[in-house]
Every structure is written in C-alpha cells, then in structure tokens.
Amino acid sequence: MKTIYIWSLIVAIPLFGSMADYRKMKKINLLHTSEVVQDTINDIIDSNSVNIQDSSLVYSLIHVESTGNDSCVGDRHLVIPSIGCLQIRPIMVREVNRILKDLGNTTRFKNKDRWSRKKSIQMFYIWKNFHHKESTNEKIARNWNGGPRGYKRKRTLQYWEKVQKKLNKQL
C-alpha cells in the first residue's frame, strides 16, 4: 500500500506542475485576448455604464424572473434556491468569481450579494460580457435560464417568449 501511495505521489507531482503551467498559460492568453472584456467588466464594477439595449434586456429578465422583487426566493423545492431579482444560484456566483479571477480582477461576490439588485445586475453583465459579447438577446436569455447550452433546449423557448414579450413592450 505504501509503495503505491508513494508511487502515486511521484506520478502526480509532474501532473500538478503541468496543470499549473496550463492555468498560467490560459490566464496569460485570456488577459491578452480579452482586454476589451476586462475593461468592460472593470467599467461595470466601477460604475453603472451600460447601453440602452443591454439595460432593456436585463430589466426584461428581472421582470420575468422575479417581477422586480429583490427579495424573491425561487425554486424552493431544490436544496439551494435561486435568490434575488435575477434568481441567481450559488453556481453563478462562483462562475462570475472565476471570470473575475481569470481576468486578474480582485473583486469577488458573495452569495449574499444575490439579494442586492445592483450586485445581481453587475454579476449578470460580467457573465454576459465574458460569455456572450456578440450573442443575440435570445441566446443570452435562453442561456441565462437554461445554462451554458440553454439556447439548444426546447424548454427555454417559452422563457425566451416571455422575455421577448417584455422587451417588445419596452421598445
């Protein structure tokens, strides 16, 4: 047993070294290829600068997700419910923090930030500007509702129709 354990350590050490090198390379690549995304994210964190089309999308999502209620708790049947005006789950908070870390930003969000409308909107824009810089409103909304491949799922079509209906009323 001990020899297997020692052998597994000897084999694992080079793997961790190469994984760390891979992460460094990935981070360097991200920093060089997405400076615009990083600048946009810094603007989002530092101020409230967004364009009108983006704001109409986020407010349509807020209306569909929570009808504007910042204290909304959804999916109570699940172990961890979605919280706030945009119905954010802890996994989205982790994803936003991962994005910020990859981009070299020291800002981090906590799960309790989901209760804040301003911070929820900031998290949404960070996610959107990183993953959906050039995506359509439909793809953004369907992925927000259904996860990374949400735009491919039939169940997100009804969600998109609700968002689109609210968007059309705003325009």
Residues of each region from the PLM?
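Bacterial Sec-dependent signal peptides at the C-terminal "C-region" and cleavage site
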Residues: A12-M25
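Positively charged, phosphate-engaging catalytic surfaces used for nucleic-acid and nucleotide handling
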Residues: L9
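Positively charged n-region of N-terminal signal peptides that target proteins for export
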Residues: M1-I4
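Catalytic glycan-binding domains that act on GlcNAc-containing polysaccharides
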Residues: K24-L171
